[in-house]
Design a protein with these regions (language model features):
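N-terminal interaction modules that seed assembly of large macromolecular complexes
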Residues: 2-56
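Low-complexity intrinsically disordered segments
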Residues: 41-130
Length: 130
């Protein structure tokens, strides 16, 4: 599973975490969050390092944020930043099959189509078993 999918799926789980669900599903959510804590920390740290490495700087070497406080990049560095971020996002992360979900387990919850697409790497589709 790709690192970006893990990070995105964690965000979805966190939005569902306050809903009352069957114990088995809540337990699986909790185990998955716990298992992927280091992955999310690695992603956030690495992303920050990429931004810091290529960000525009003033003459004293300090990062020059834009008016919204976000990182800015010189035009000639944007492709490199995008490439580095893509490489980070596509880093493979192993998720045990036992922590993947069946459609039936997730049916009691409400998901947007976008959330289902993000979460799909963690779903054991019945069609996969045929």
């Amino acid at each position: 599973m790709k690192l970006i999918d893990v990070v995105s799926a964690r965000k979805i789980i966190e939005t569902k975490a306050t809903e009352k669900v069957e114990f088995n599903l809540a337990y699986k959510f909790a185990k998955l969050i716990k298992l992927t804590n280091d992955d999310e920390e690695f992603y956030n740290k690495s992303q920050r390092e990429i931004f810091e490495q290529y960000a525009k700087r003033d003459d004293k070497g300090n990062v020059l944020p834009d008016e919204n406080g976000r990182y800015q990049f010189d035009t000639d560095k944007i492709a490199t930043v995008e490439s580095e971020l893509r490489k980070l996002a596509t880093t493979e992360v192993a998720i045990p099959e036992s922590l993947k979900f069946t459609v039936e387990e997730l049916t009691p919850l409400k998901f947007s189509v976008e959330e289902v697409m993000i979460f799909s790497s963690l779903i054991k589709d019945n069609d996969d078993e045929k």
